[in-house]
């Protein structure tokens, strides 16, 4: 699935310190920095995406130029893998710490309760989403789940993809948590950059 048209970031990517690793512009950040950045720029980040990068995705990008473009095409690629943050520290970025996708999601869900942030979960099995529908409100009382959807594992038709976009738009999320597995999820975010409501992660 190719990206449709061009996308201009509404937040300056130069605000994000980066440590290039095998060509991937990995954000040289820690969790407090990321949460502060998210809170300050969330509205302007709608339609953009964050890659959650580890050794596997970084090596895959090094070997596949099209995937490298995907990894570097969002607002940032956060260092989910410990070796990435360790490499950054050795290269002169002492502030660079491992920031995992699940930790970021849970931090945003907790922080977002008081702020009224709305979350949409896209991907995974229906069984997993059903469990999350029960677990998340218990763990984060007051959380706003805008929607959940488990798409087919096969490639979607244009009609199905458009229906997904309309479903997400109607839900008006602040965050779109994409769980399709790498590299599919990153390619999906790149293809839908600028077409969805919410920050994709």
Residues covered by each model-derived region:
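A short helix->loop->beta-strand "cap" motif at the edges of active sites that frequently abuts
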Residues: 47, 117, 196-199
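Conserved beta-alpha
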Residues: 11, 85-171
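Proline-aspartate-enriched helix->loop->beta-strand connector
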Residues: 168-182, 198
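Conserved acidic residues
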Residues: 75, 146, 174, 199
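Short glycine-rich anion-binding loops that position phosphate/pyrophosphate groups of nucleotides
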Residues: 54-58, 180-185
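Short amphipathic alpha-helical segments
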Residues: 63-64, 89-91, 133-134, 188-191
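Catalytic alpha/beta core domains of metabolic enzymes, predominantly
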Residues: 181-201
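N-terminal nucleotide/polyanion-binding subdomain common to many enzyme families
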Residues: 2-98, 102-103
